[in-house]
């Protein structure tokens, strides 16, 4: 049987699919980033800051800085405005509008630098091109949230325009995962506390979380159950003060 020619339409579709796959593969190859945080050079555009800095290192870089309170998850945040604060050295922070620092357990895990309209790279494409060379990173950063973001091994870099001028954010993604896990654990613990019941080992009575009489049970006599069903299986009965 002679071979049947492939219809022109089907052939065209097939060629388009092949072309799309080639472009996708090429794009993925171009944006691959295996760099690690500790491999990043000290880019002059970051004005002496880098991920992983301690409080003491930041204080040495900016003596007037005052650190904020650390929350229950180990996170502390602070922003400085070198252009407006008379206490900051204008020379070492030339063309910088804002610097925001996020710490986790005393280490810098997010760094944001926003630049003035006098900064040397104002267009997003030229900013990404310049910063990629300065940080020794791949030149192609995929579009993300109105800017361009590059995700590497354990960290990400986002470039965007704010009020017409560029800004860059470096984020320790491993640290962000740690923060998210701590918040989830705290939320789960709070939810468990809401449903937990207190048992009095002396009287074999239990008190739900919304029963104020539970406060009268001494710590030494308390037994904690995840819910009333568990308490009742253990032989406890609902206290009359809670009925």
Describe the residue ranges of each PLM region:
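Mature, structured domains enriched in cysteine- and short glycine motifs
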Residues: 181-243
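Mid-chain, structured segments of secreted extracytoplasmic proteins
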Residues: 69-120, 243
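Bacterial N-terminal signal peptides
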Residues: 13-23
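N-terminal secretory signal peptides that target proteins for export/translocation
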Residues: 1-10
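Non-cytosolic coordination micro-motifs
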Residues: 29-76, 110-193
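Extracytoplasmic/periplasmic, Sec-exported soluble proteins
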Residues: 38, 46-53, 91, 100, ...
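N-terminal, post-signal-peptide region of Sec/Tat-exported proteins
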Residues: 50-90, 221, 226-227, 232-234
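Sec/Tat signal peptide C-region and signal peptidase I cleavage site
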Residues: 24-28
């Amino acid at each position: 049987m002679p071979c049947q020619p492939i219809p022109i339409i089907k052939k065209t579709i097939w060629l388009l699919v092949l072309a799309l796959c080639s472009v996708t593969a090429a794009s993925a190859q171009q944006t691959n980033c295996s760099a690690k945080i500790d491999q990043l050079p000290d880019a002059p555009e970051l004005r002496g800051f880098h991920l992983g800095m301690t409080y003491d290192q930041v204080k040495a870089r900016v003596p007037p800085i005052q650190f904020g309170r650390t929350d229950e998850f180990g996170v502390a945040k602070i922003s400085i405005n070198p252009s407006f604060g008379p206490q900051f050295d204008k020379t070492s922070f030339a063309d910088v509008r804002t610097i925001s620092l996020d710490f986790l357990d005393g280490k810098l895990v997010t760094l944001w630098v926003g630049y003035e309209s006098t900064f040397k790279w104002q267009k997003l494409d030229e900013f990404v091109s310049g910063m990629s060379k300065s940080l020794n990173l791949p030149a192609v950063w995929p579009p993300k949230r109105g800017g361009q973001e590059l995700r590497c091994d354990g960290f990400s870099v986002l470039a965007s325009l704010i009020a017409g001028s560029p800004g860059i954010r470096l984020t320790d993604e491993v640290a962000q995962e740690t923060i998210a896990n701590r918040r989830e654990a705290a939320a789960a613990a709070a939810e468990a506390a809401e449903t937990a019941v207190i048992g009095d080992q002396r009287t074999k009575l239990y008190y739900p979380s919304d029963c104020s009489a539970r406060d009268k049970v001494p710590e030494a006599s308390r037994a904690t159950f995840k819910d009333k069903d568990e308490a009742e299986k253990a032989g406890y009965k609902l206290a009359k003060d809670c009925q």
